[in-house]
Amino acid sequence: MHPFASYVLRTYYKATGWNEDNLYANLTRSSNAVLDFTVPRGLHFTVSKSPNPLFKTTYSMTAMPSLSGSLGYIFTSCDLNVLSSGTVRFKDMLDRFKVYDQPRRPEGKEEEWLAGERVDTRDYLLYGRFYLPSGRLDALYSTRLSPTVQLSVAAISDPISGTPVDGRRRTDPSNIMLNLQHDVGKWCTEYTYSAEDSMWGVRFLHNFGRLAPSSWETTNGENGTNTSAPGNASNSRAGVKRVDEEDAVEGGLRGRVSVGAELYFSAKERSAGVSTGIRFSTMPDATPPSAQIPPPSPFTPDPTTSGPSPALLNPRPYPQPPTTITALFNPMLGHIQSAYTARVSRDLALATRFDFNVYSYDSEWTMGAEWWLRRSPRSSTDSGEEGAEKPSYPSPLGEVHGVVKARASTNNDVSLMWEGRIRQMLVSLGVVSDLSSRAKPIKAIGIEVSYFSSE
């Protein structure tokens, strides 16, 4: 489950038009959502509130295995539509398998002029969190320098606790990190710097194929374009088959390919590293069939009385299964990783990953599954609470109210987690076990409860 601060940050990126998916660091994001989910350990409570669209507060407490807590504050320069935990779209609050949209060039905010002078300012986000009783302080500042450039500054201040036994002074754990991202849609470059170990890094991601149309192009397309104009002659002939054109070969997966690499160097440690990766994603975007069904017209009978139509109960299957295939290679460490993730049905996604080291011959095979839980259409409309806002039309496929994730690997680790919504709260419950240990088969178990309000 995403923390409240992460949810606000993603909402800020969406409001400002920044694509956080077009990064080399997120190359394996789809498979990681199924294979690397974080199981809560102990007992955690989080309460957050949005007094106004610009300012947010969040408080968290860990009761087990030790008592600790934190408080955080978030301020943004633009209004954010942050919903409450009872009304927010459930899938927006957790990492999940998804084939992301085609990359597009980021667009800046509209210019605002007053008395012949430009008065609009660039958007920014400020975030700070203080941990008790450790006294650690985290801070984040993110701003848009231009429509295609974003700067993020993160700082960590962790006071040194205790006196070392050998009398030597411990290394200061405080650190400041700079991150500069330049995204033009077709490619994205990321520059990073860490002051703790004087590490410099650069990441690059290139997308092959066409870019998604901008909002201006989409608007012009919706308003209609004169395809008979000379400049649009190619569009009018797009559907005409050439004499030498061959028929498309059926079968296989159609999609887009992205390749990237990263290079980093530490002046303090006098070490360097490099890695490269490739990703294949199917097209079009993996939107569920429920999102492709238009809302019923006023003349459509009420599904709660007459029942949904057979076409809605049996939606058209995917023309091709939503699939993501990735491969990473680190030549200096000798690490090779390949992953395959696909949605095999409407509510089930499967993933597998193989890791191998060419130097030590160590290998690991990991398998995972993601299964979405839905309420029946009739129960989802009849079980609404008093005063709760009901949807304008009931979903014929049922409302998603939970997800079950499972992971198993060849190192005998098995993880199982359930995430769902109980009344107005978001709840995560998970367990991690070690099948090779008879003395302690359960390594960790935990539950996390989150509640936030926008009123």
From Swiss-Prot:
Domain of life: Eukaryota
Organism: Coprinopsis cinerea (strain Okayama-7 / 130 / ATCC MYA-4618 / FGSC 9003)
Positions of region (Disordered): 216-249, 278-311, 377-399
InterPro entries for this protein: Mdm10 (IPR027539)
Disulfide bonds: none
Summary of subunit composition and partner proteins: Component of the ER-mitochondria encounter structure (ERMES) or MDM complex, composed of MMM1, MDM10, MDM12 and MDM34. Associates with the mitochondrial outer membrane sorting assembly machinery SAM(core) complex.
PANTHER family noted in UniProt: MITOCHONDRIAL DISTRIBUTION AND MORPHOLOGY PROTEIN 10 (PTHR28035:SF1)
Compositionally biased spans, kind Pro residues: 291-301
Main location: mitochondrion
Compositionally biased spans, kind Low complexity: 217-227
Name of the featured protein: Mitochondrial distribution and morphology protein 10
Topology in membrane: Multi-pass membrane protein
Job description of the protein: Component of the ERMES/MDM complex, which serves as a molecular tether to connect the endoplasmic reticulum and mitochondria. Components of this complex are involved in the control of mitochondrial shape and protein biogenesis and may function in phospholipid exchange. MDM10 is involved in the late assembly steps of the general translocase of the mitochondrial outer membrane (TOM complex). Functions in the TOM40-specific route of the assembly of outer membrane beta-barrel proteins, including the association of TOM40 with the receptor TOM22 and small TOM proteins.
Listed Polar residues bias regions: 228-237
Record text about domains: Lacks alpha-helical transmembrane segments, suggesting that it resides in the membrane via beta-sheet conformations similar to those predicted for other outer membrane proteins and porin.
Keyword annotations from UniProtKB, A to Z: Membrane, Mitochondrion, Mitochondrion outer membrane, Transmembrane, Transmembrane beta strand
Name of the gene this protein is made from: MDM10
